């Protein structure tokens, strides 16, 4: 299955990524090869092969719910370049810079 450069640009725009024309061409080629390789799996005869739903025998392994001391805020904020109202200030990632 051929992935077009237009499809790469569309997914990049949805992901808020930008690529040069050469990168777009390279991604289209690479993604096409990956999809072709995955499509080869459809040709494998799996008759009689048990369904594999997980590779691990254990399920729902969780740690004990024990309260632990967190990181000291003063120590944490020593290396923070920008802070505002006791929060770490980071660059906006939304177009209008508003709330999510």
From Swiss-Prot:
Q: Where is the signal peptide?
A: none
One short Pfam family name for this protein?
Answer: GatC
The protein's annotated catalytic reaction(s) are: L-glutamyl-tRNA(Gln) + L-glutamine + ATP + H2O = L-glutaminyl-tRNA(Gln) + L-glutamate + ADP + phosphate + H(+); L-aspartyl-tRNA(Asn) + L-glutamine + ATP + H2O = L-asparaginyl-tRNA(Asn) + L-glutamate + ADP + phosphate + 2 H(+)
Q: What class of enzyme is it?
A: ligase
Q: EC number(s) of the enzyme?
A: 6.3.5.-
What biological process terms from GO does the record include? glutaminyl-tRNAGln biosynthesis via transamidation; regulation of translational fidelity; translation
Record flagged with keyword Ligase: yes
GO function terms (MF aspect): asparaginyl-tRNA synthase (glutamine-hydrolyzing) activity; ATP binding; glutaminyl-tRNA synthase (glutamine-hydrolyzing) activity
The protein's UniProt keywords, in alphabetical order, are: ATP-binding, Ligase, Nucleotide-binding, Protein biosynthesis
Kindly give the InterPro entries that the UniProt entry links to this protein: Asp/Glu-ADT_sf_sub_c (IPR036113), GatC (IPR003837)
Function statement: Allows the formation of correctly charged Asn-tRNA(Asn) or Gln-tRNA(Gln) through the transamidation of misacylated Asp-tRNA(Asn) or Glu-tRNA(Gln) in organisms which lack either or both of asparaginyl-tRNA or glutaminyl-tRNA synthetases. The reaction takes place in the presence of glutamine and ATP through an activated phospho-Asp-tRNA(Asn) or phospho-Glu-tRNA(Gln).
| Family from the record | Belongs to the GatC family.
Subunit composition?
A: Heterotrimer of A, B and C subunits.
Recorded hits in NCBIfam families, A to Z, give: gatC
Task: Give the protein name, as stated in the record.
Answer: Aspartyl/glutamyl-tRNA(Asn/Gln) amidotransferase subunit C
Origin organism is Streptococcus equi subsp. equi (strain 4047)
């Amino acid at each position: 299955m051929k992935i077009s450069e237009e499809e790469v640009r569309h997914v990049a725009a949805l992901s808020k990524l930008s690529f040069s024309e050469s990168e777009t061409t390279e991604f289209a080629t690479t993604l096409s090869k990956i999809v072709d390789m995955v499509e080869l799996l459809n040709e494998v005869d799996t008759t009689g092969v048990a369904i594999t739903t997980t590779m691990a025998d254990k399920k729902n392994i969780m740690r004990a719910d024990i309260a632990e001391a967190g990181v000291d805020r003063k120590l944490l904020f020593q290396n923070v370049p920008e802070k505002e109202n006791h929060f770490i200030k980071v660059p906006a990632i939304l177009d209008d810079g508003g709330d999510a």
